[in-house]
Amino acid sequence: RPPRPPPRGTPPRRHSFRKHLYLLRGLPGSGKTTLARQLQHDFPRALIFSTDDFFFREDGAYEFNPDFLEEAHEWNQKRARKAMRNGISPIIIDNTNLHAWEMKPYAVMALENNYEVIFREPDTRWKFNVQELARRNIHGVSREKIHRMKERLESDLM
């Protein structure tokens, strides 16, 4: 027999998530990594996953190569998926995430693993100031590149 429906007037059952995925987004230099570290300070069990990690050499130097960007994103998604399967919470994704399609794989795997997805952007005064972003970003992304990224940033996602 199928289960009986709840009596009339019964409030809908809300899903209570016990695990959280923070999807950070913002231009280079906007404060994403600082926000990720603050979240990790607030939640000491948190793990931070960034596609940028793929480009750090063993000696700690950052060496970005756009030819490997797709592989780097797949690598980061695989790490996040493994952490979700292990029930780690919260998980923090520290990527630029300029477009919805960049966040979708993380959101899908989060829902498949019963995680609440929380979207966050740094709330810094300079988050759209191209000159300041170029000065502050830790990977040497040029002002021109940040300007192009800013033009492509989907602003109505949150």
Task: Go through the PLM ranges and name each one.
Residues 1-8:
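Long, basic/Gly/Ser/Thr-rich N-terminal segments
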Residues 6, 13, 112-158:
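Conserved GTP-binding G-domain of TRAFAC-class P-loop NTPases and closely related GTPase folds
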Residues 12-18, 84:
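Phosphate-binding P-loop
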Residues 21:
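Walker A (P-loop) ATP-phosphate-binding motif of ABC ATPase nucleotide-binding domains
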Residues 24:
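Hydrophobic anchor at the beta1->P-loop junction of P-loop NTPases
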Residues 31:
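Conserved glycine(s) of the Walker
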Residues 67-118:
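Glycine-rich phosphate-binding loop used to anchor ATP phosphates in small-molecule kinases
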